[in-house]
Amino acid sequence: MTLNICPEINAISNEIISTRRDFHKYPELGFNEHRSAKIITKKLTAYGLDVETGVGKTGVVGVLNPKHTGKTIALRADMDALPIQEMGDVEYASQNDGIMHACGHDGHMAMLLGVAKVLSEKPEHINGTVKFIFQPAEEGYGGAKYMIEDGVLNGVDEIYGAHLWNYQPHGTIGVKSGPVMAAADLFTITIKGKGGHGATPHGTVDAVVVSSHVILALQTIVSRNTNPLESTVVTIGKINGGYNFNIIADNVVLEGTARAYTEKNRQLIKTRMHEILTGLSIAFNAEISLEYEDGYPPTVNDKSCAEKLLHSATKIVGAGAGEPYLSMGGEDFSYFANEKPGCFFFIGSSPKDQEPLSTPHHCSHFDIDENALLVGSSVFVQFIRDQLI
C-alpha cells in the first residue's frame, strides 16, 4: 500500500514519535494531566498560537489565526491514561506505577502537536481559524463536558477528532457518517429476598434464583425487543451475593453495562429493564431496585463532515480509506458532536506483523505501529488545507 505522507509531517516524524513516547513514559489519569498540559502549553506557545490553560480543569487550547473572520475548525485530542500496570517490554514503558497509556491518547496528543507545528509555520496560508483542543479525562470522567462548560466551542463551526485504532491495520482510515461509537451506560440491580436454611427453601425468597431469572430475562431485550440490524448490548459483568453453601441468600447485587448506537434503543433498553424487573418482582415476591446511570451518549458523525474528511483521507491512504471497524465502546467526543457538526474517525494502528485485535485497547501489553502517527497527522493537515486554503 502506497501512502502519501505529508512532507512536512515526514520531516518531523522523529519528533512526533519521540513526543508520543515521552507522554507514554509518564502517563497521567483524568484531571491529573499536569505534566502533559505543561508540555503541550510550552510547545503551542513556541509555535506562536494563542494558548489558554485550565480549560475543563486540566485541558489546554491553542488557537491559530484567532482573529480571522473566516471559518473556525476545531481539532481535538484526549490526554488521559488508564489505571493499568503496563506489562509490555518497551524502552518507553510507563514509569508511573499502575498507570498506563493503554488506549492511544499519548499518540493523539503527539499527532495534534505535530499538526499544530506544521500549520503554524505558514499561518497566512490558512484562510480561517484552527482551534486545537487538548481534552482531559475522556476515560469515564466526561472531560468534554467540562470544556464545553468553559466555552471551548464558542465560535467553532465544526469539530473533528480521531482515535488510533488497533482493530484496523496501519495504512487505513475508518470514517463514516452516522453513529460510530455507542452510548455507554451502567446499571446496578439490587435484589432483596428472604434468607433461610438451604434445607427449608419454602420459607424463603431466594435472591440467587431471582437473580438468575433477571439475568436471562434481560438478554431478551437485545434478542427480542431491538432490531437485530441495530447493534445493542446488555451485559451483566458482576454478581455479588450469598454467604455459605447451605444458606439461601437474602440479597444479590448485579452490575452491568448497556450499549446502543441510537438514542431510541438506549431509551428502549432502559424502559424494558424497568418493566422486566417490575414483573419479576411480582412473580417472585422479591424487592428489586434498579439504579441506571447514563454514560456517554452515542457519537454520531455529521454526514457532510464525514464526507469531507473521507475525501481528505483518500488523498493520504488511497483505497485504505473506508468503513471503520466499529465497536460498542463509548467516547465523550459525543458531547462535542452533539453541540457542533463534527466527525470522529479511526486511524489503523495495529502493530507491525500482528493481526488486528492482537493487542487490544485497555490491555496491559497495548502498543501501536508508530507509523500510524504520521498517517493521522497527515490526514489532519490535508483536511485543514482542503477546507481552509
Residue ranges and their predicted role:
Residues 46, 212-389:
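Metal-dependent amide/peptide-bond hydrolase catalytic core
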Residues 13, 17, 37-41, 112, ...:
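Hydrophobic face of alpha-helices
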Residues 65, 78-80, 135, 190-194, ...:
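Solvent-exposed residues in well-ordered beta-strands and their adjoining turns
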Residues 2-101, 106, 110-126:
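Acidic/His- and Gly-rich active-site-bordering loop/insert found
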Residues 74-76, 187, 344-350:
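Non-cysteine beta-strand/loop elements that form the S-adenosyl-L-methionine
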Residues 60-61, 82-84, 88-100, 107, ...:
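Histidine/acidic-residue-rich, glycine-tolerant segments that coordinate divalent metal ions
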Residues 52, 131-133, 289:
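A structural signal for isolated positions on well-ordered beta-strands in alpha/beta enzyme cores
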Residues 23, 62, 75, 105, ...:
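Divalent metal-coordination and catalytic microenvironments
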